[in-house]
UniProtKB/Swiss-Prot annotation:
It is found in: Cytoplasm, Nucleoid. One of its GO terms (cellular component) is cytosol. It comes from the Bacteria. Signal peptide: none annotated. Homodimer. This is Nucleoid-associated protein Sfum_2790. SUPFAM superfamilies: YbaB-like. Pfam families: YbaB_DNA_bd (PF02575). It comes from Syntrophobacter fumaroxidans (strain DSM 10017 / MPOB).
């Protein structure tokens, strides 16, 4: 097997691992916000797809219509998770774009 000059696959893999570890730490600190019901239910999700907070406006709390509240929470959380995944994909794309590893393909990053 002939390797091109200047290409050290182990060094490239180590660099990728280091960058990925740093990115995971950074994503834990970055957040997105999402809401449903015109802001009646709001959530904050970090870049690791962890829900950090849920806020529910008192006006939407109706003991006679719990299903509506549940639907709003689900909608807000799903929107927050989607936004978080998009943010994470963009950040990971920055890492992948800076590396030149022939044959390496990571779904969603290239």
């Amino acid at each position: 097997m002939v390797m091109s000059r200047g290409f050290n696959p182990m060094q490239q893999v180590k660099a990728l691992q280091d960058k990925m570890a740093r990115m995971q730490e950074e994503l834990a600190l970055k957040t997105v916000e999402a809401s449903a019901g015109g802001g009646m239910v709001a959530v904050v999700v970090n870049g690791r797809q962890e829900v950090l907070s849920v806020k529910v406006d008192r006006q939407v709390v109706d003991p006679e219509d719990i299903e509506m509240l549940q639907d709003l929470i689900v909608a807000a959380v799903n929107d927050g998770l989607r936004k978080s995944q998009e943010m994470a994909a963009q950040e990971m794309g920055k890492i992948a774009g800076g590396l030149n590893i022939p044959g390496l393909k990571i779904p969603g990053l290239f």
